[in-house]
Structure formats: C-alpha cells, structure tokens
C-alpha cells in the first residue's frame, strides 16, 4: 500500500511539472510572437545595426535607427490586428 502511494505521488509531481513547463513555454512563445509581430522592442534594428556597425562604425547606428523607424511605421499598416502586450 505504501509503495503504491509513493508511485502515485511521484506521478502527480511529474504531471504537475510538465504542465508548468507547457504553460511557461506557451507564454514565452506568445510574448516572442508579440515582439516579432509588433516591433515592440527595437531588438531587430539594433541587432542589424550592431552587425553593420562592426564593419562600418557609425553607419550601423544609423541603419538600426532607420530599420526601427520603418518597422514602427509599417507594422500597424501591415498588421492592424496585432497589438503589443
């Protein structure tokens, strides 16, 4: 009887941790989609700008700023139903 109870409680712990992982990854994906869709953060422009800036210092900052500005202007037009969370 004690062995069965132990196995049962171990099973509950495993299923509980699986559901926590699933909900965490779901919320992470949702926030990631929000950032990609809405350009809520200037990460893309800054990343590209920094890569270019590694080759041409100064130009990378300008390219990053331009990409962010273009993204902020075009995203509401191209994805009107997408909102930043």
Curated annotation (Swiss-Prot):
Pfam family, one: Coiled
Family, per entry: Belongs to the hssA/B family.
Protein name: HssA/B-like protein 59
Originating species: Dictyostelium discoideum
